[in-house]
Amino acid sequence: MPSILEDPTTKIPPPESLLLSLKSSSLNTPLKTTTKTGANVTLYPITNGPLSLPQPLLRFLHNEFSAEIEMGCTYPMEQPMKFEAFGEYWFGMFGVVAVLDREGDGECELSVDSERDWEKECLGTFYVKPNYPGRCSHVCNAGFLTTNAARNQGVGMVMGKAYLHYAPLLGYKYSVFNLVFENNVASVKIWERLGFSIIGRVPGAARLANSETPVDALIIGKDLTGEDVVDKD
């Protein structure tokens, strides 16, 4: 979800702790996990901006995000971003890409030369950035996208757990999601299972394509200090 008061064409300056954390070897280490369907997945942290990604992958993710916006059900934007703007918006600070493992695959990073069938092998992505500027920049926000081919496989939960791994390593102390639309039941369930709480509500905040009446936006938060990831299910 977009950071509070954020114009997608601008960027809230990162906290100093984030700039230091981006050099950490633990932050740059991919995570390996398994979805509920038994698929092996690697989550690759992206710390060097959109140009460090394979451009076919970036274009695929741009197309997926554009389709999500045009669907009009989960993000507040009404028009898709241009390709260059998307790359900076999503990967300009810190992002993660979830990729299906291939048998015998020893690849430990996504280089600009990586060649994959991204439509089949890229499962999703998320970004992490400050939710507020300056003295409040230790509070973070994130945006998530599960690719169309990977839906209903538990990828959202995998990325949610990865978010709770990386966000504290980036120096963030608290997480806020500003606009989780109440009718996005799957998203709400994921965050509740991971120990998040509903800390606010904006009545009738969204005019969504999947509702004839305005939908409430939930503000969902979690303290990131000294807590392990707990799946409550």
PLM ranges: what are they?
Residues Y163:
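Conserved alpha-helical elements of the SDR catalytic core
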Residues A39-L61:
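A short beta-loop-alpha structural element at the N-terminal edge
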Residues A167-V180, A186-K189:
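Conserved GNAT acetyl-CoA-binding A-motif
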Residues T125, I199-R201:
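Residue-level detector of high-confidence beta-strand sites
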Residues C73, M77-R151, G160, D223:
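Acetyl-CoA-dependent GNAT
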Residues G154:
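Glycine-rich phosphate-binding loop
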Residues D7-S21, S25-S26, G38-N40, L194, ...:
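C-terminal "cap" of GNAT-fold acetyltransferases
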